[in-house]
Structure formats: structure tokens, C-alpha cells
Swiss-Prot record:
This is 1D-myo-inositol 2-acetamido-2-deoxy-alpha-D-glucopyranoside deacetylase. The lineage of its organism: Bacteria, Bacillati, Actinomycetota, Actinomycetes, Pseudonocardiales. One of its GO terms (biological process) is mycothiol biosynthetic process. Its cofactor is Zn(2+). PANTHER family: 1D-MYO-INOSITOL 2-ACETAMIDO-2-DEOXY-ALPHA-D-GLUCOPYRANOSIDE DEACETYLASE (PTHR12993:SF26), N-ACETYLGLUCOSAMINYL-PHOSPHATIDYLINOSITOL DE-N-ACETYLASE-RELATED (PTHR12993). Keywords: Hydrolase, Metal-binding, Zinc. The gene is mshB. It catalyses: 1D-myo-inositol 2-acetamido-2-deoxy-alpha-D-glucopyranoside + H2O = 1D-myo-inositol 2-amino-2-deoxy-alpha-D-glucopyranoside + acetate. SUPFAM superfamilies: LmbE-like. It comes from Actinosynnema mirum (strain ATCC 29888 / DSM 43827 / JCM 3225 / NBRC 14064 / NCIMB 13271 / NRRL B-12336 / IMRU 3971 / 101). It comes from the Bacteria. The keyword Metal-binding applies.
Length: 283
């Protein structure tokens, strides 16, 4: 990094756990380097599927208390990653998890996708103007895997960054197909893996040709795993004690813990961004 001003990174995520799943290593790396990291979460994740049987009465179709529980999970995950500035867009519970495409949750009065995109973008712009990040991260136009809240997060972040005079780069977080497939092959060699191995093409990933930026997070994987463990309702983490590790969501599909996290530069100067979100800025 060659910035003359203190570097500031802002990440916009849809639900608690997305910050750890998609960008946990990146957050931990930059936080450890002294970068001011701000995480903005758009909903409480009220519609998430719950893994531990003892907690399933928190579900949206039962007590509907999952969102509050996930606030505490997110707080613990942020602590594991070194984040000291976390904010909910519009405040706690302003917008609700919309659920997957075609579900009744899409029409909830507080559903994120049912809300005003302009109001949401304005709320985010206010945070951007307060924090003044040089770099902002969110999802691509498909939201990584098509979740309506991820797509809306992409839309409002794109709008807010376009209206901002302080953001120098906008990145989309993506997953490398080559590294994901290599990681899956390594998982197949592990004994006692408690999850189902992914089928070819089953895990969300993009062609490596579109990736512009690769961030080495190999020294921060333990922090990422601690953050993932904090999301106990959503993620199961497995480690074999010999360096092997994997995690799974409620579908029980094994996902590799990759040494790099990948991004596509959506706007801003490309020079220097290949290995550092801030590379070449301010020089």
C-alpha cells in the first residue's frame, strides 16, 4: 500500500456469516495490518436454516428469534477477525432477510428486497461519507449465488459508490473455480471428513479469467475459521488436527478453506490491484 492517508476498507454484506464466508481472510489480513475495516450488514439473517437441533425453535416459522441470536454470532465473528467497526444498514432490524427466490419471505413488509433501493443506497452513502473508505467490497451482479439480498446489496452498493466522491475502488468478491476444484480434490483425500464431497460445479465459483485481484490470506486462515465457528447456527467447521480443514452450511456439502480470496475490480484504477486491494492508490 502506498496511500498517504490511513487506509480504510468497507465491506457490504447481506447477512451475518457472509463477512466470514466470502471475505473473512481478507478482513483478518487487513485488520492485522492496521487498516480501518468497517463491515456493513444489511439484515439480521432471520430466514437462515438452523443447523443445531436444539436451536431450531428460533426459526422464522417458529419463535422467529433467529435474527437476534445471529447478532451475537456476528459480534463474535467480527471480534475473531479483528473488526471493531460493524454497522447494520439502517440500524438493527431495519430490513429483514428476504429468504431465497420465490419464498413467502420475499413479500414480508420489512424484506430487504421489498424496501426502497434508493433509501437503502442513501443509508449506505451516509455510512460511506462518514467512514471515507478508499476501497469498498460487495458481491457481483449475481450476488455470488443468486440470493435476492446479495443482489440487492450489489445494487445499492454500486449506486452508493457512484454517488460518492471518496471511494477509489469497488471490488466484487468472487470464488475461483480453479482453486475451489483443487481444494475439493484435496478434501477427497482426507480421512473422516464428516461432510458430503461437492459434485463438479456444485459450489459457486467464477471462471478465473474474470478475476483481477488475488489476496493471499494463508496466514489468516485460523482467524477465518474462528469467525466461521462463531456462526454456530449456520456453519459447521471441521479440522482434523493435522492441518486439514473444511466447513459446511446446512446442506452438509464440504467446502475447502482456500489460501486466497478473489475479487473482480468493478471500478477504479487497475494498476497495482493484482495482489492488494489498496495497491497503487495514493501514489
Amino acid at each position: 500500500m502506498t496511500l498517504t492517508a490511513p487506509p480504510r476498507l468497507l465491506l457490504v454484506h447481506a447477512h451475518p456469516d457472509d463477512e466470514s464466508l466470502w471475505t473473512g481472510g481478507t478482513i483478518a489480513r487487513y485488520a492485522a495490518d492496521g487498516v480501518q475495516v468497517t463491515v456493513v450488514t444489511c439484515t439480521l439473517g432471520e430466514e437462515g436454516e438452523i443447523i443445531p437441533p436444539a436451536l431450531r425453535e428460533l426459526a422464522a416459522d417458529a419463535a422467529d428469534q433467529l435474527g437476534g441470536y445471529r447478532v451475537a454470532e456476528l459480534r463474535a465473528a467480527c471480534a475473531a477477525l479483528g473488526v471493531t467497526d460493524h454497522r447494520f444498514l439502517g440500524g438493527h432490524g431495519r430490513w429483514r432477510d428476504s429468504g431465497m427466490v420465490g419464498t413467502a419471505a420475499n413479500a414480508h413488509p420489512r424484506a430487504f428486497v421489498a424496501g426502497s433501493a434508493q433509501e437503502q443506497a442513501d443509508e449506505l452513502l451516509a455510512i460511506i461519507n462518514a467512514v471515507k473508505p478508499q476501497v469498498v467490497v460487495t458481491y457481483d451482479g449475481f450476488g455470488g449465488y443468486g440470493h435476492p439480498d446479495h443482489i440487492r446489496a450489489h445494487e445499492i452498493t454500486t449506486a452508493a459508490v457512484a454517488a460518492s466522491s471518496v471511494v477509489e475502488r469497488l471490488f466484487h468478491t468472487v470464488t475461483s473455480r480453479e482453486e475451489t476444484e483443487a481444494g475439493a480434490r484435496e478434501l477427497a483425500e482426507l480421512a473422516d471428513l464428516p461432510f458430503r464431497l461437492p459434485e463438479p460445479g456444485e459450489l459457486p465459483a467464477v471462471d478465473d479469467a474474470v478475476i483481477t485481484t488475488t489476496i493471499d490470506v494463508s496466514e489468516h486462515l485460523m482467524a477465518k475459521l474462528r469467525a466461521l465457528r462463531a456462526h454456530t447456527t449456520q456453519v459447521t467447521v471441521w479440522q482434523d488436527g493435522a492441518g486439514g480443514a473444511s466447513y459446511a452450511l446446512s446442506n452438509g456439502i464440504a467446502q475447502p478453506v482456500l489460501p486466497n480470496e478473489h475479487y473482480v475490480l468493478a471500478s477504479g484504477p487497475a494498476e497495482g490491484a493484482e495482489r492488494d486491494l489498496f495497491g497503487g492508490l495514493g501514489g
